């Protein structure tokens, strides 16, 4: 077993060897290096062929038509394209957008930008378990609501929102529905023929593909429309200009094909490791809280708060495992996770949370090592904590008045 142990698969995944092998075929002079948009010679035709195959592979994972897949530089761009693109296209109908407070920053900040452009955005609260109250969502919908954007799987908690029901609600009211599926592709079965979703964002690097490539599903029937955000040569049916990065797209396509092939195997493997991790940590430690809901979440993300331990010192104490507190995009700030705050967790618990994310290459040995390391580290840090001592003595910390110096 090699240290440090990687348990941050929700931040990014290593590229699968099978994927890297395919990508290598599309880079050098004796490989498939042509520009897929070059129509006048074989180099272009061959590149176009593998790009078409990649498009089909991405579409197959979600049961879409390949013509509904628009390649982008990642889920952040896909979210921007869907939300800004749809809001601008449908603005004559209305300027109201609904999203949730626990969305990824790529959705929240895109909505903030639209507010600066005169749109009105409702950021919905979630329940204590991280899920939306669908009745409240229905009550928030108005005649001038043009778009609802709700993520499929939350990147910090792993909870799975009820996309099927939300889709029905939106379709009934003729509201466009966007779903950020960066964390659910390859982990939850997605069938866009069954789901009433208009736009769906995907990322390559969350599914053992390369970074820097993503996709946006844009429904054809009934047709979903959007305004392009990137202008140029009219690539991707005018929705996203820019030379197609053949090796990146082939990487994403292969990753999605492998995800489909290995779905059952990955799910069983990760579910068993999740149980081992949760049982190991939650069984004989007190003041340990599971964030989210265990019965409606993906097995790969486990978010736990350890009371009476400061998050930053905890991360430093467990430097032999690569985990995160909050999401990678915001872990550079010392603010507590806005997602955990939205669940109603107090600052102390939000600060002492750790997200373990398990993946295809995680082993039982690594999980067992992690459990032991967590137990020892938490025990050691709590021994140094005066708050833990007071708690042990039965003092209600909320009733303590601290002296101000």
UniProtKB/Swiss-Prot annotation:
Task: Tell me the PROSITE patterns matching this sequence.
Answer: AA_TRANSFER_CLASS_5
- Disulphide bond pairs: none
Query: Recorded E.C. number(s)?
Result: 2.8.1.7
Per the UniProt entry, what is one GO biological process?
Answer: [2Fe-2S] cluster assembly
For the modification N6-(pyridoxal phosphate)lysine, which residues carry it? 206
- Name the catalytic site residues: 329 (cysteine persulfide intermediate)
Q: Pathway, according to UniProt?
A: Cofactor biosynthesis; iron-sulfur cluster biosynthesis
Which residues does [2Fe-2S] cluster bind? Answer: 329
Pfam family for this entry, one: Aminotran_5
**Which Gene3D superfamilies does the UniProt record give?**
Aspartate Aminotransferase, domain 1, Type I PLP-dependent aspartate aminotransferase-like (Major domain)
The chemistry this enzyme catalyses reads: (sulfur carrier)-H + L-cysteine = (sulfur carrier)-SH + L-alanine
Q: Which UniProt keywords apply?
A: 2Fe-2S, Cytoplasm, Iron, Iron-sulfur, Metal-binding, Pyridoxal phosphate, Transferase
Cite the SUPFAM superfamilies for this sequence: PLP-dependent transferases
- Is the keyword DNA-binding in the record? no
> What are the GO cellular component annotations?
L-cysteine desulfurase complex
Q: Which GO terms describe its molecular function?
A: 2 iron, 2 sulfur cluster binding; cysteine desulfurase activity; metal ion binding; pyridoxal phosphate binding
Principal cellular location given in the protein's record: cytoplasm
Query: Is Iron set as a keyword in this record?
Result: yes
Q: Where in the cell is it found?
A: Cytoplasm
Cofactor(s) for this UniProt protein: pyridoxal 5'-phosphate
Query: What positions does the entry give for pyridoxal 5'-phosphate binding?
Result: 75-76, 155, 183, 203-205, 243
Subunit annotation: Homodimer. Forms a heterotetramer with IscU, interacts with other sulfur acceptors.
- Tell me which family the UniProt entry assigns to this protein: Belongs to the class-V pyridoxal-phosphate-dependent aminotransferase family. NifS/IscS subfamily.
Role noted for this protein: Master enzyme that delivers sulfur to a number of partners involved in Fe-S cluster assembly, tRNA modification or cofactor biosynthesis. Catalyzes the removal of elemental sulfur atoms from cysteine to produce alanine. Functions as a sulfur delivery protein for Fe-S cluster synthesis onto IscU, an Fe-S scaffold assembly protein, as well as other S acceptor proteins.
Q: What is this protein called?
A: Cysteine desulfurase IscS
> Where does this protein come from, organism-wise?
Pseudoalteromonas translucida (strain TAC 125)
Gene for this protein? iscS
